[in-house]
Structure formats: structure tokens, C-alpha cells
Amino acid sequence: MRCPYCQHPDSDVIDTRKLHNGETIRRRRKCEACGRRFTTYERVEMVSITVVKKNGEREPYDREKLMRGVRTACYRRPVPAQALEALANDIEAELMARDEPEVPSSLIGDMVMRRLRAIDDVAYIRFASVYRSFADIGKLREAVDELLGQGH
């Protein structure tokens, strides 16, 4: 692996760890030339999935876009970063298992909502308020009442 500091083409692996139930490998490396250390992450490349938006536009699936939405919903909530990574990994595994080149954005939104609901009620309501585009406080109240009515 090329050193990000001096661009030397070779480095030694000094530590390897599995993360996220073995779905990601973290490697600590040391450059053979300059001796500086750096970290690399290795994960299986997803099959190309196209997301079909509500307006019919198509765009490539973007894990970072998913993570930004989930992080925003969980802002200042007691949700560990590992839980968010696991949520994204679960969604990606489910998308890959479907073995379909195109998926509607609504399917991904539903997957996120189902998982957020199990993680944190406030994050779920925050995400739902944007995802479902609540037009008024009444719709938001219905979502909260539904959540409370189901024993959360």
C-alpha cells in the first residue's frame, strides 16, 4: 500500500483487526521508507446499485449519503457510532441480497426507519419528519402517538 506521506509504494502491516462483525478489516501500516504509520480499511465492494428517487431520477447508491442522514437524525443522541455503522451494513446486506440493480429510495428510507426505531425513538421521529415530509404538527403528532402506542 502506498504511503500517504512520502508516496513510497510499500508498507508493512503491523496490526490487523476485524470490525463490524468481520465486514470491515482495519490495518495499521508502517511505511518502509519514512517509518510513519497510517491506517487503511478494507471492505467488500458493493455491487453497483442504482437508487430511483421519488421524482424518477436515478443516482448511484451512496453509503455516505445514507450515513449523513442517519447521523443527522442521531445528533446529540446516545447512539454509538458502531450502531450507525451496523445499521448501514445491515441495509447494504439487505440491498445486496435483493439482487436487483435498481431500488426505490422509499425502500431504503423504510429500511432506515425500521432500524432507527429499534435504536432510538427520538432519532426515529427526526428521520421520519424529514423522510415523510410532515406538512404540519398534526402529522408529526400522529407519528409520535403511533410510536407511543406500540410500547416504545
From Swiss-Prot:
A single BP term in Gene Ontology: negative regulation of DNA-templated transcription
Keyword tRNA-binding: no
Renumbered zinc finger spans (unnamed): 3-34
Domain ATP-cone: 49-139
GO-annotated molecular function: ATP binding; DNA binding; zinc ion binding
Family annotation (Pfam families): ATP-cone, Zn_ribbon_NrdR
Keywords noted in UniProt: ATP-binding, DNA-binding, Metal-binding, Nucleotide-binding, Repressor, Transcription, Transcription regulation, Zinc, Zinc-finger
Superkingdom of this protein's organism: Bacteria
Cofactor binding summary note: Binds 1 zinc ion.
Cofactor: Zn(2+)
Annotated function: Negatively regulates transcription of bacterial ribonucleotide reductase nrd genes and operons by binding to NrdR-boxes.
Family: Belongs to the NrdR family.
HAMAP family (UniProt xref): NrdR (MF_00440)
Designated name of the protein: Transcriptional repressor NrdR
Origin species: Roseiflexus sp. (strain RS-1)
Gene (name only): nrdR
